[in-house]
C-alpha cells in the first residue's frame, strides 16, 4: 500500500506540475530526482512524509486513496480524482498535437510558394534592384575626360587666355572638375581666311614690306 501511495503521489505531482489548474507544487523535478517523474514506468520516487507535520485524519486519507496531489507541505494536501487527471492529460495531448500541426503547416506554406503572385514579384523586383546597385558600386573605376577650350581676346592687355576644363568621373554619382589656365602674348594682327592666328609680338614679312614701302614714299616726297 505504501508503495502504491508513493507511485500515485509521483504521478499526481507530475499532473499538478504540467497543468497547474488545481494546485501549486512546492517541489521541482530536480528536488524529486531529475526527469525521472516524466515517465510513469520509471521506478517510484521516494518521498518522505513527516507524520508529525500531518494530522491523523490526513494520514488515514493517504492510506486509503490512490489519487493524491502533494502541494506545499506541510500546510495542506489536495486530492484529485484519477479520471479527471486522465481527461486533463488527453486534452493536453490534443492541444499539443494541434499546435505542432499548425506550426508545421505554417512553415510549409511559407517555404513552398505560400506567397501571393504579386508578393513574389515584388520580392523578385527588390532583389534585382539591390543586385543592380551592388553591381554599380562594385564596378571598376573609370574616367571620362572632356576638354573645352575657351579663347577670350582682351584688346586692353593683348592677352590670349585659354582655359582647359577636365571633367573626371571617378565612380557613379561622384565627379571632380579641374581647371588649367594659360596665357600668351597676343598681337592685334591676324590673317583672315587662314587657319592660323598671329600669336606673337614680332613683325611679320608683310609688316616689314609695308614699312619699307612707306619709307620709300616718304623719302621721295621729301626730296
UniProtKB/Swiss-Prot annotation:
GO terms for cellular component: extracellular region; fungal-type cell wall; prospore membrane; side of membrane. It is found in: Secreted, Cell wall; Membrane. Residues 199-223 form a propeptide. It is a lipid-anchor; GPI-anchor. It comes from the Eukaryota. A lipid is attached at residue 198 (GPI-anchor amidated asparagine). The keyword Cell inner membrane does not apply. One of its GO terms (biological process) is spore membrane bending pathway. Its main location: secreted. The GPI-anchor is attached to the protein in the endoplasmic reticulum and serves to target the protein to the cell surface. There, the glucosamine-inositol phospholipid moiety is cleaved off and the GPI-modified mannoprotein is covalently attached via its lipidless GPI glycan remnant to the 1,6-beta-glucan of the outer cell wall layer. The keyword Zinc does not apply. Residues 1-20 form the signal peptide. Keywords: Cell wall, Glycoprotein, GPI-anchor, Lipoprotein, Meiosis, Membrane, Secreted, Signal, Sporulation. Involved in sporulation. Essential for completion of the nuclear division. This is Sporulation-specific protein 19. It comes from Saccharomyces cerevisiae (strain ATCC 204508 / S288c).
Amino acid at each position: 500500500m505504501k508503495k502504491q501511495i508513493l507511485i500515485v503521489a509521483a504521478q499526481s505531482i507530475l499532473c499538478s506540475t504540467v497543468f497547474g489548474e488545481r494546485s501549486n507544487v512546492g517541489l521541482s523535478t530536480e528536488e524529486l530526482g531529475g526527469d525521472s517523474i516524466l515517465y510513469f514506468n520509471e521506478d517510484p520516487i521516494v518521498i518522505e512524509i513527516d507524520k508529525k507535520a500531518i494530522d491523523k485524519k490526513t494520514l488515514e486519507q493517504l492510506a486509503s486513496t490512490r489519487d493524491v496531489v502533494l502541494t506545499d507541505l506541510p500546510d495542506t494536501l489536495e486530492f484529485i480524482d484519477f479520471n479527471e487527471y486522465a481527461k486533463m492529460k488527453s486534452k493536453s495531448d490534443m492541444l499539443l498535437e494541434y499546435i505542432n500541426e499548425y506550426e508545421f503547416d505554417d512553415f510549409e506554406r511559407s517555404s513552398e510558394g505560400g506567397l501571393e503572385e504579386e508578393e513574389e514579384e515584388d520580392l523578385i523586383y527588390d532583389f534585382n534592384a539591390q543586385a543592380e546597385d551592388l553591381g554599380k558600386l562594385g564596378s571598376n573605376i573609370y574616367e571620362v575626360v572632356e576638354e573645352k577650350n575657351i579663347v577670350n581676346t582682351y584688346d586692353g592687355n593683348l592677352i590670349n587666355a585659354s582655359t582647359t576644363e577636365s571633367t573626371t568621373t571617378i565612380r557613379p554619382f561622384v565627379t571632380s572638375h579641374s581647371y588649367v589656365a594659360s596665357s600668351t602674348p597676343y598681337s592685334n594682327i591676324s590673317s583672315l581666311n587662314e587657319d592660323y592666328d598671329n600669336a606673337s609680338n614680332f613683325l611679320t614679312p608683310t609688316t616689314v614690306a609695308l614699312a619699307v614701302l612707306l619709307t620709300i614714299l616718304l623719302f621721295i616726297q621729301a626730296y
